[in-house]
Amino acid sequence: MSIKVEWIKFTRLKKCATLLVQLSLLRYRYMVLAYNHKFDCIVVTIYCGCLFWFSNGALFTEGKARDRGRWAKATMKKNYGVKLKIFLFTILLAFETNTFTPYTSTFSHFARGCL
């Protein structure tokens, strides 16, 4: 049981890491070619990586919540709290980047696509 849960955690971690690398490469290439503005590229990459990571956080243990017992229910509740914090943080981040960068439409379209 423990080995299975650890293996699921490892595969999820690997998928999250590969997606984050792909997003960063794609976004970096697009931003350098279009605007040559690296800060917006980094912000959007971190945003998408965090959003993907914490949206799949509840899937780190498999099975239904009633089958996994008290520990899994506690982690599910914790993940919802973390999701809310990340969502509020990304809203704040969107306002900050929209204030300081002139390329607001790019960030907004990319963020809407990820949500």
From Swiss-Prot:
It is found in: Membrane. The chain crosses the membrane at residues 41-60, 81-103. It is a multi-pass membrane protein. Keywords: Membrane, Signal, Transmembrane, Transmembrane helix. Residues 1-34 form the signal peptide. One of its GO terms (cellular component) is membrane. Has a role in meiosis. This is Meiotically up-regulated gene 106 protein. It comes from Schizosaccharomyces pombe (strain 972 / ATCC 24843). The gene is mug106.
